[in-house]
């Protein structure tokens, strides 16, 4: 009886797409059933796609994936074109019959994946999709893949494979949503274009150039980015921006060579101690950056504060997971903290430690920084403020290694080297009240029967900047995969309930008037 009860529960879970609690009667049974039906029908195609290695560093891998996905889009009636890109072509697809009375939406996803170390995976191969469920101990254990093609699929089962969630899963969700509409004879409410990036995992260094070269082809009214994890609650999620990143290396100089600490201690200044004092001057004990002007350009209005406060973050659980007693005091909450530029010391070096440590005063001390930017504080602005602050602490900035003349003239010497930041690493944000934001909000609310979680700006950096700068259109990130998907790591996975619900959400988006 218990086994029958579990089987019935699984069947109902698939048919009703029980990814998250929905308000009673809010979700369309037709959309639920349609999404479940076509998701099930396409699992085999998904597994076959996952079997293709797609290392962003291997052109042959990229070509095979581009070819396979081109066939997949053509099968759904898309017109396609491979966009040349140094041996790693991007894929463009468009549904024919463009209606000038409709808005045109460009869907972005990426077909490349992170490199893998097969020995770190708990299965035979990262490219051999493995179906798993949790056992009584809460551990993932493999079950026959054939169960995926049956009629008793548990939405909590997961498919483990490289790129299952990042980003082949969302690509298959879009294709499956198109299948569902095609079967019903329905046309999307918007003109649909798609671009599949082939180097996202390398930071999309050529995305802007490819878009510029195909500007007319990719012309659109809005950009939807199908990438990234949903909110931790697994509720429908819309993300309206991302921080950028700038990198800087600070070198503080001491004597021309390492000195014996007995002979020269108390006489020659230690650059490691000076660097420590310099870094300490950049932030206070609450974690706020004290460099003058660092936050000044950031303004958050009451409407944005209200939306951020409504994000269902469990900060007590978050701090417990991170293993910290309290958060830094940059914003009122986690979401607000991400709206400001940050300053992070990502590495330091001076002398040696452990068995290799010597009794010397090191000649240099180096700190590597990453500065997370926001649209109001571009990289050049923050790097400029950083340099001014260092000079205000009494340092003379040099280019490269200081000359003998500079050493004789200045007591405190330092160098700041900053990387040229491409548009792919730029911060970008769309107004949450913009037409595209309102359109997606309505689509998700109508489809799922609850308000989506709206993230004003996520803390990480994704390559939207290049696309937004080249296309000159508003964008929204539409994450569809489970937050605990092990993205970029070993044992990457996709929850089947998320797959079905993602199909459902995209059906809703494609049917919502814009």
Regions found by a protein language model. Give the residues of each.
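N-terminal signal peptide c-region/cleavage motif recognized by signal peptidases
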Residues: 21-24
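An extended, acidic, His-containing surface patch that forms the Zn2+-binding/catalytic region
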Residues: 100, 232, 290-364, 375-388, ...
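Active-site metal-coordination/substrate-binding segment of hydrolases
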Residues: 102-193
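Acidic/histidine-rich catalytic neighborhood of metal-dependent amide-processing enzymes
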Residues: 152-241
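Flexible glycine/proline-rich, aromatic-decorated loop/lid segments
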Residues: 237-253, 478-481
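A short core secondary-structure module
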Residues: 265-286
């Amino acid at each position: 009886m218990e086994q029958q009860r579990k089987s019935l529960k699984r069947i109902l879970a698939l048919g009703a797409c029980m990814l998250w609690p929905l308000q009673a009667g809010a979700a369309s049974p037709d959309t639920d059933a349609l999404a479940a039906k076509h998701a099930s029908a396409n699992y085999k195609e998904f597994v076959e796609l996952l079997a293709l290695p797609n290392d962003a560093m291997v052109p042959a891998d990229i070509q095979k994936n581009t070819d396979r996905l081109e066939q997949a889009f053509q099968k759904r009636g898309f017109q396609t074109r491979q966009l040349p890109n140094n041996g790693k072509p991007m894929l463009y697809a468009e549904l024919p019959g463009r209606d000038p009375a409709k808005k045109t939406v460009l869907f972005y996803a990426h077909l490349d994946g992170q490199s893998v170390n097969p020995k770190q995976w708990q299965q035979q191969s990262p490219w051999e999709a493995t179906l798993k469920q949790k056992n009584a101990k809460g551990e993932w254990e493999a079950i026959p893949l054939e169960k995926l093609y049956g009629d008793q699929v548990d939405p909590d089962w997961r498919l483990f494979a490289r790129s299952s969630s990042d980003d082949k899963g969302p690509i298959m969700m879009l294709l499956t949503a198109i299948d569902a509409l095609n079967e019903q004879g329905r046309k999307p409410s918007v003109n649909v274009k798609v671009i599949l990036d082939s180097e996202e995992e390398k930071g999309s260094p050529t995305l802007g150039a490819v878009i510029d070269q195909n500007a007319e082809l990719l012309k659109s009214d809005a950009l939807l980015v199908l990438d990234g994890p949903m909110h931790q609650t697994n509720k429908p999620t819309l993300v309206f921006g991302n921080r950028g990143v700038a990198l800087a290396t600070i070198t503080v100089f001491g004597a021309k060579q390492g000195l014996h600490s007995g002979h020269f201690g108390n006489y020659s200044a230690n650059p490691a101690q000076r660097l420590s004092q310099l870094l300490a001057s950049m932030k206070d004990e609450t974690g706020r950056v004290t460099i003058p002007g660092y936050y000044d350009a950031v303004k958050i209005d009451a409407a944005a504060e209200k939306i951020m406060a409504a994000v269902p973050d469990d900060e007590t659980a978050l701090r417990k997971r991170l293993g910290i007693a309290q958060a830094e005091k940059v914003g009122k909450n986690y979401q607000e903290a991400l709206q400001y530029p940050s300053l992070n010391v990502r590495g330091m070096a001076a002398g040696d430690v452990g068995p290799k440590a010597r009794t010397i005063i090191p000649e240099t001390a180096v700190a590597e920084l990453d500065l997370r930017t926001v649209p109001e504080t571009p990289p050049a602005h923050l790097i400029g403020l950083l340099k001014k602050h260092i000079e205000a602490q009494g340092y003379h900035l040099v280019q490269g290694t200081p000359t003998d003349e500079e050493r004789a003239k200045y007591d405190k010497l330092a160098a700041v080297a900053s990387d040229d930041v491409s548009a792919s690493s730029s911060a970008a944000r769309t107004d949450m009240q913009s037409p595209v934001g309102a359109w997606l909000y309505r689509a998700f609310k109508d489809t799922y029967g609850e308000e989506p979680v709206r993230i004003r700006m996520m803390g990480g950096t994704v390559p939207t900047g290049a696309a937004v700068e080249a296309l000159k259109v508003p964008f929204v990130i539409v994450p569809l995969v489970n937050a605990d998907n092990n993205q970029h790591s070993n044992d990457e996975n996709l929850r089947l309930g998320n797959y079905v619900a993602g199909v459902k959400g995209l059906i809703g988006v494609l049917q919502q008037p814009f």
